[in-house]
Amino acid sequence: MNIFEELKARGLVFQTTDEQALVKALTEGQVSYYTGYDPTADSLHLGHLVAILTSRRLQLAGHKPYALVGGATGLIGDPSFKDAERSLQTKETVLEWSDKIKGQLSTFLDFENGDNKAELVNNYDWFSQISFIDFLRDVGKYFTVNYMMSKDSVKKRIETGISYTEFAYQIMQGYDFYELNDKHNVTLQIGGSDQWGNMTAGTELLRKKADKTGHVMTVPLITDSTGKKFGKSEGNAVWLDADKTSPYEMYQFWLNVMDDDAVRFLKIFTFLSLDEIAEIETQFNAARHERLAQKILAREVVTLVHGEEAYKQALNITEQLFAGNIKNLSANELKQGLSNVPNYHVQSEDSLNLVDMLVTAGISPSKRQAREDVQNGAIYINGDRVQDLDYQLSNDDKTDDQLTVIRRGKKKYAVLTY
């Protein structure tokens, strides 16, 4: 099975320009290819991972990746299938975000070894050197307004309005392809399926300006089996930056993937062989309640993104919280595992009497209910049941001098911080 066949078998090929020519290029020698990442935030997220891992698969097959950080295009904003104009970021912010994204990409691509080691480029380097007049003369003249208006990504914005700034974005992305082809012999661009219009602007410019053929391959935008856009948890993006989405939160995200998606996601997001995945699928289908596919998926992706130690910690937090073993976890681990539960910062004037604190922290609705909860054995401090109405919280109840975990009943948690 050649690399293109494997990508297809994994569900990673959505659309290509001349497929026969692309397969020929990929099987006859080393291809230099690129994927672009606009710094629209200070971190990449799971939505970017499909293209990143596809890029890694091609590198493992011997091809040479260029990771393009859009320091210039990030200042403009891509209109593709966006309902409204993006708010423009400052140059300083975009450059800062570009640096952070560079660091994240080095986790996935090999920038050190071999004649196909990855190269990092920033389109700000060439766009900052070209004047507006030169850009219009040397690039703009190859694009007709009719051609630009025909793109689906533009059509959808015509009625609501699109600025010239965003309208011109596709020309900038097209010029990226031309520049990388001219300087580095890059002949293939990879990106999300929503980028097709911008990406083919590059092949058009290559054909008209340099009489060369460029290839484009898009990866699918991933949705779950209900059609919901993939990569968000509780409406929030799942970030690759551990400070924005902890390894534990990412682990839980994959662990909670629906049964109908789990095997498909193993093909897309892991480097397990297709034979291994077929074996997992057989075991998984025999006992879906054991969630084998989700557990392996969570292990593989968290290890890939954050490393083996982070995976082990996420697994330990999961197991200890499930067993109610609060005392086996550090304050840092508890912060990860209980990041979504109510948090109350204890004030110096607060009463440390347990009944009072249950009401103050919003764990029990009233003192009467709080007393009943304590007497009925429904209150736990750091996993230990407390039934003393006169119990006073003390330093002994603080984990690493930072927090106390109170549980009411089986599932209602609150974290007290100091």
Curated annotation (Swiss-Prot):
**Annotated positions binding L-tyrosine:** Y34, Y169, Q173
User: PROSITE patterns, from UniProt?
Assistant: AA_TRNA_LIGASE_I, S4
In its keyword annotation, does this UniProt entry include Disulfide bond? Answer: no
A GO molecular-function term, please? tyrosine-tRNA ligase activity
The compartments listed are: Cytoplasm
Q: Name one GO biological process term.
A: tyrosyl-tRNA aminoacylation
Q: Which Gene3D superfamilies match?
A: HUPs, RNA-binding S4 domain, Tyrosyl-Transfer RNA Synthetase
What are the record's GO terms for cellular component? cytosol
Q: Does the keyword Zinc apply?
A: no
Signal peptide (from-to): none
Question: Looking at the record's lineage, which domain of life comes first?
Answer: Bacteria
* Residues at which ATP binds: K232
State the span of motif ('HIGH' region). 39-48
- E.C. number(s) listed in UniProt: 6.1.1.1
* Keywords per UniProt: Aminoacyl-tRNA synthetase, ATP-binding, Cytoplasm, Ligase, Nucleotide-binding, Protein biosynthesis, RNA-binding
The family database entries (NCBIfam families) matched by this protein are listed as: tyrS
Query: What PANTHER family would the database entry show?
Result: TYROSINE--TRNA LIGASE, MITOCHONDRIAL, TYROSYL-TRNA SYNTHETASE
What is the purpose of this protein? Catalyzes the attachment of tyrosine to tRNA(Tyr) in a two-step reaction: tyrosine is first activated by ATP to form Tyr-AMP and then transferred to the acceptor end of tRNA(Tyr).
**What's the name of the protein?**
Tyrosine--tRNA ligase
* Organism encoding this protein: Streptococcus pyogenes serotype M5 (strain Manfredo)
Source species taxonomy? Bacteria, Bacillati, Bacillota, Bacilli, Lactobacillales
